Design a protein with these regions (language model features):
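PRPP-associated nucleotide enzymes
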Residues: 1-186
Length: 186
């Protein structure tokens, strides 16, 4: 355990988010504010617990643009989890939104939030998560809800789907959603 702890490297997500913002600048081709960040973009946390880390991130990257946060609660009915989310804004006036979080496993929080944000007059929706796993890809992948999803290669599993081939039987086919961008930091 000691050897493992001695070799742990803590990675600050500011480098990742700076790369995401640069990618968005190129894609959006919008007017830029101070530090060359897009001015038509809102940085958002997916829940109240993520807002404090988001504010620390904003300080590190010198973000002076708009920020927002959602809050959520879980209701347990019939053994299933129902997510209830609230957003302080009800009209984003066409601004694009970048949701920043640390991990996406199944994507339920982000799917629910994306549905709500679409009803709040937002522009494009983007998601940046440091760690992403393949569990969120099944029949209803989180990438279906966003214009673009960003993740690092820290916990990126190859996306595969099963298909039947007449000559070879069941095959695993490597597939990556077109709107998923992996930023290599490791």
């Amino acid at each position: 355990v000691e050897a493992l702890m001695d070799n742990v490297e803590i990675i600050d997500n500011s480098k990742f988010i700076k790369n995401v913002l640069y990618s968005l600048e190129v894609e959006m081709s919008v007017n830029k504010g101070n530090d060359d960040y897009p001015i038509n973009l809102v940085l958002m946390s997916s829940d109240a617990g993520g807002f404090k880390p988001l504010m620390k991130l904003c300080d590190k990257i010198r973000w002076i643009g708009e920020t927002a946060s959602a809050s959520k609660s879980r209701e347990y009915k019939n053994g299933e989890t129902t997510l209830t989310q609230l957003i302080a804004h009800n009209d984003f006036r066409g601004k694009d939104i970048l949701i920043v979080d640390d991990i996406c496993i199944y994507g339920g929080t982000f799917k629910g939030l994306a549905k709500m944000l679409r009803d709040c007059n937002c522009g494009k929706l983007y998601l940046a998560v440091s760690h992403m796993t393949v569990q969120n890809l099944g029949e209803d992948p989180v990438t279906n809800y966003f214009d673009k999803v960003y993740c690092t290669n820290s916990k990126y599993d190859n996306y595969t789907y099963k298909t039947m081939d007449r000559n070879h039987g069941l095959l695993d086919i490597l597939s990556q959603p077109k709107n998923l961008e992996i930023i290599k930091l490791f």
